[in-house]
């Protein structure tokens, strides 16, 4: 029932895009430049994982490339990302004796996505996990923690690596270094106001940019036309911080819900590409991160305890002291479960002991102290003291912990079917820690429809729009209904690189 309703909504959105295209075509023709202020081979819009990867590959293929970023600093959401990346087959995984394969990763992505994914892309993504990891290390010089391997919700086994600095900046800064080395200008405060499509050939040939744009001041900056002799590559990300647009897609995602995204995650280029005639699908599948902490704004740092310590090595319980979900289920299942608990007047908590936080301390040195200092989590000497301090019934909480400890000893969780990893130990060593849980709007699964090399499809004829490519969160049909945590970086780098290579090969 849910899927069919969403399919109807998606069809309606596409129909609206076609009508919008017809209504704006004449205006676009009238505005088409007679001359251009600047000319490049490839113009990349967006400076996150995907955009920078596309720029690097296009430049290496011989193209004259420029990257445009509307915000004052580069990186977008990528630079504040948690720095965890799926790396099936990596040394960290093998050192822990974890059995994994591209086929298992592919299955996990499809199951979480309710098989709404583009299967060819999912297969390519899974097969690219190890080569992508090696590319980031060997080509970019990214440093990952050598002995840390983690498991996000929905994955069958631990398979993500963590950047040495515990942030997506550990990758983005290396991409920016490579751009500088290759001579690729990354221009900030560049707001793309319009994408030009030749009224005769239908080819995308450039953009209208407001140079010196001051976010969020509409109309600021000097208008400049830029020609793309080969292609424009769209890597503009999602719209999680555009409340009006996200509520249009999913009315449940009101302003009451915080977002993990940077302020510039807005919808203007989603609207512009619809007007251009680009096909978009699954726009109403918008993910909320279940591990958010309500006592800080945005992504923050509290999620690191809620996910890395408690979901992977501890427990999630409600204010009655009971588990309410498999802590390693996919993000939608967990976020929905939290929303049900909150609707019924019960708070949700992430809890763990000294052993639970040990892997997080290794992955993210200093994070525990920062969370305690900011009162995002609270430390107690004993489980009983935690129960007393939070109002959770101690007898129920102790029973919940005891039951889980037995599951750890049995290496099987019959109640919630959670994966018990091979280094999990019972929860019994103080001190104890607790943090509150609340979902935050996080990722857009829908977006532009592309082929395997990032060519954007037209809504009228299902054929590629000449000169237009896309990658990253601006695209749809890769993750389907739910994106698995730690797969975003893999997606952005793999398909960003492919789009950049293909764009540079345009005649």
Language-model-detected regions and their locations in the chain:
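Conserved redox-cofactor binding core of oxidoreductases
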Residues: 127-223, 229, 242-244, 293-294, ...
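A glycine-rich dinucleotide-binding beta-alpha-beta segment and adjacent secondary-structure elements
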Residues: 396-482
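Beta1/beta-strand and adjacent pyrophosphate-binding region of the FAD-binding site
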Residues: 36-48
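N-terminal secretory signal peptides and thylakoid transit peptides that target proteins
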Residues: 1-15
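A conserved FAD-binding loop/helix module that cradles the flavin
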Residues: 254-261, 477-503
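Glycine-rich FAD pyrophosphate-binding loop
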Residues: 61-78
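Glycine-rich loop(s) and the adjacent beta-strand/alpha-helix scaffold that form part
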Residues: 214-296, 495-498
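An anion/pyrophosphate-binding glycine-rich loop and adjacent beta-alpha core
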Residues: 270-274, 279-392
